[in-house]
């Protein structure tokens, strides 16, 4: 069973639909015992980092998530919350990944690309060998919606570029994974990534 952590950060229907198409059993929950008994854990979400962290603290899940031993996948703000710190609300994160979250600025534009904020659209991803990207060709395209990004660091397993800004498309540390893009909105390639997450053995 997959636990989808519900911490009041917006509509979870798209990730539920994506898991349903893969035939996966899931439970949307904020219950610690359900989360600890799950085979996989998803931390999705959209919204603002400081309020999202406050919701995790209020439920005590900020202490639970970093101690999980099963595969955990953070999506979009879920990945950002697993980093050391976010400039969005100047808030400390869960500290799983050794990255900091920064805001795109107009200075990130390049001569070839004047960026818009938020970044909305498709970007190709350069990925290292990882069970999360098994069977996905290097340079595959994924769908993004975000104004903040995680800096590249030792935990970066995939990166992309917006304007002249390189940033982490995906992070991994042990059993913890994160993706900045939305696999549930990225067509067949995103479905393959979710399938890899559901079937991987660590």
Tell me the role of every PLM-derived stretch.
Residues 42-44:
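Structural motif
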Residues 67, 100-202:
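Amide-donor transfer/coupling interface in amidating biosynthetic enzymes
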Residues 1, 26-37:
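Short acidic low-complexity segments
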């Amino acid at each position: 069973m997959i636990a989808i952590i519900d911490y009041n950060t917006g509509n979870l229907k798209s990730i539920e639909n994506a898991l349903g198409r893969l035939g996966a059993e899931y439970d949307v929950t904020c219950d610690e015992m359900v989360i600890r008994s799950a085979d996989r854990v998803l931390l999705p979400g959209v919204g603002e980092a400081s309020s999202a962290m406050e919701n995790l603290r209020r439920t005590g899940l900020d202490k639970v998530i970093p101690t999980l031993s099963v595969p955990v996948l953070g999506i979009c703000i879920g990945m950002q919350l697993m980093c050391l710190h976010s400039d969005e609300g100047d808030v400390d994160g869960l500290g799983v990944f050794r990255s900091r979250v920064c805001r795109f600025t107009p200075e990130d534009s390049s001569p070839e690309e004047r960026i818009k904020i938020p970044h909305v659209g498709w970007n190709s991803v350069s990925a290292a060998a990882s069970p999360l990207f098994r069977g996905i060709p290097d340079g595959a395209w994924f769908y993004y919606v975000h104004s903040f990004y995680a800096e590249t660091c030792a935990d970066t397993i995939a990166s992309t570029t917006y304007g002249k800004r390189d940033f982490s498309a995906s992070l991994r540390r042990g059993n913890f994974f994160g993706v900045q893009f939305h696999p549930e909105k990225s067509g067949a390639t995103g479905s393959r990534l979710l399938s890899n997450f559901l079937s991987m053995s660590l």
